[in-house]
Swiss-Prot record:
Pfam families: ABC_tran (PF00005), oligo_HPY (PF08352). It comes from Escherichia coli (strain K12). ATP binds at residues 38-45. Keywords: ATP-binding, Nucleotide-binding, Transport. Belongs to the ABC transporter superfamily. This is Putative phosphonates utilization ATP-binding protein PhnK. GO terms for biological process: organic phosphonate catabolic process; organic phosphonate metabolic process; organic phosphonate transport; peptide transport. SMART domains: AAA (SM00382). InterPro entries: AAA+_ATPase, ABC_transporter-like_ATP-bd, ABC_transporter-like_CS, Oligopep_ABC_C, P-loop_NTPase, PhnK. Forms a complex with PhnG, PhnH, PhnI and PhnJ with the suggested composition PhnG(4)H(2)I(2)J(2)K. PANTHER family: PHOSPHONATES UTILIZATION ATP-BINDING PROTEIN PHNK-RELATED.
Length: 252
């Protein structure tokens, strides 16, 4: 493919002075993982909501597969979120149906893309539970009975079961114990490669960014202050703020 999967041009959304983001531009290519890093309040999550069709920007354009995202109907944008895109929330229960079984959470996504045969849907759900290291015998259990790490893995299975082209992740390892984080990152890295996913991941954790991202955007107070290949940005940061971020991690 000789054109970006997602193209963001001069995007702005400011909901208060210094809150939000302004004049952000980047391209995302098929199979590429883009990390967005920066401290809390830098505009990362607001940007993620705008580029994933969940918050209309005030200025700028977003093109997905050469189609203007916000020129589409709201119904078409919702369809993208159900089928070709996935969204992994920091708090997994925000992305799961609490009163629907684990298998049902995965099955709903399959049905959104046209699956109708109950036996096939259940078999695929069981396969994906195993893929994300959840025992298949938990298929009929509610997500609320799972640990935080299992809930996050279930949310990932729900999003990836339809082999989406593009996945948006907001602090997917936030709030998890270090050992649980390590297993989840291992799992994510393997699935990203296996499914050739394009991913935009927001994280404040530079270790997560180094492990998963091909390229980085560094944000400070709503502005992208540095961008480039992950290893270059983290090993040879140019902007004083990026240098500060990297040095603070090294000191810790």
């Amino acid at each position: 493919m000789n054109q970006p999967l997602l193209s963001v041009n001069n995007l702005t959304h400011l909901y208060a002075p210094g809150k939000g983001f302004s004049d952000v531009s980047f391209d995302l290519w098929p199979g590429e993982v883009l990390g967005i890093v920066g401290e809390s309040g830098s505009g990362k999550t607001t940007l993620l909501k705008s580029i994933s069709a969940r918050l209309t920007p005030q200025q700028g354009e977003i093109h997905y597969e050469n189609r203007s995202l916000y020129a589409m109907s709201e119904a078409d944008r919702r369809r993208l979120l159900r089928t070709e895109w996935g969204v992994v929330h920091q708090h997994p229960l925000d992305g799961l149906r609490r009163q629907v079984s684990a298998g049902g959470n995965i099955g709903e996504r399959l049905m959104a893309t046209g699956a109708r045969h109950y036996g096939d849907i259940r078999a695929t759900a069981q396969k994906w539970l195993e893929e994300v290291e959840i025992p298949a015998n938990r298929i009929d259990d509610l997500p609320t009975t799972f640990s935080g790490g299992m809930q996050q893995r279930l949310q990932i299975a729900r999003n990836l079961v339809t082999h989406p082209k593009l996945v948006f992740m907001d602090e997917p390892t936030g709030g998890l114990d270090v050992s649980v984080q390590a297993r989840l990152l291992d799992l994510l890295r393997g699935l990203v490669v296996e499914l050739n996913l394009a991913v935009v991941i927001v994280t404040h954790d530079l270790g997560v960014a180094r492990l998963l991202a091909d390229r980085l955007l560094v944000m400070k107070q709503g502005q992208v202050v540095e961008s480039g290949l992950t290893d270059r940005v983290l090993d040879d940061p140019h902007h004083p703020y990026t240098q500060l971020l990297v040095s603070s991690v090294l000191q810790n």
